[in-house]
Amino acid sequence: MIDFTGKTSLITGASGGIGSAIARLLHKLGSKVIISGSNEKKLKLLGNTLKDNYIIEVCNLANKEECNNLISKISNLDILVCNAGITSDTLAIRMKDQDFDKVIDINLKANFILNREAIKKMIQKRYGRIINISSIVGIAGNPGQANYCASKAGLIGMTKSLSYEVATRGITVNAVAPGFIKSDMTDKLNEKQREAIVQKIPLGTYGIPEDVAYAVAFLASNHASYITGQTLHVNGGMLMV
């Protein structure tokens, strides 16, 4: 049984489907949750479902000062889940420098800052769990998403490097790479598009946000204390590595 009673977790991108599912599960398992994102209205709606033992922290990850301040506000941090990310899709020949930079800045650089600042706190207590949410496309690539794929591949490389650096300090650093997870975005696909994607998934269905949340909870738990520097793929068999 996973029990996070007495632990404090920070979840970024908590206003989205996957982020909110992670926050709800960690909260259900006993953790105090700090839910962060840029959409205060959605964060408040999530908070209403949690009822207690939570804190809302509105943060714009494009602002590096806000990234640093987000961690500094937390006196005791046990679990960090870096889930926030953006897309700005177009073919590489049409992609402007700023389209590439803004995705890298939020999906990779901001998450590096959060990891770095969290590690500083976790080293003091010689305990910590960091989970970075990557993507199937960080391994497989995807046309029209050179910026997004680069950012998600970078997260995996960063996760491995950091796991080496802090392994002797009681801190584990892992990644979760979701495949196609049911969301508002997938709901907008037409039936033909949905069927084409499902045909590529051996389990024959989209995942749900809770599938990712349970993977995160496992990696954050003591059951995964001997696992670090790894990427847990949650994709229904769409990519087997």
Curated annotation (Swiss-Prot):
Residues that bind substrate: S135
Top-level taxon of origin: Bacteria
Cited SUPFAM superfamilies: NAD(P)-binding Rossmann-fold domains
Pathway of action: Lipid metabolism; fatty acid biosynthesis
Gene Ontology molecular function, alphabetical: 3-oxoacyl-[acyl-carrier-protein] reductase (NADPH) activity; NAD binding; NADP binding
Function text: Catalyzes the NADPH-dependent reduction of beta-ketoacyl-ACP substrates to beta-hydroxyacyl-ACP products, the first reductive step in the elongation cycle of fatty acid biosynthesis.
Official protein name in the record: 3-oxoacyl-[acyl-carrier-protein] reductase FabG
Annotated source species: Rickettsia typhi (strain ATCC VR-144 / Wilmington)
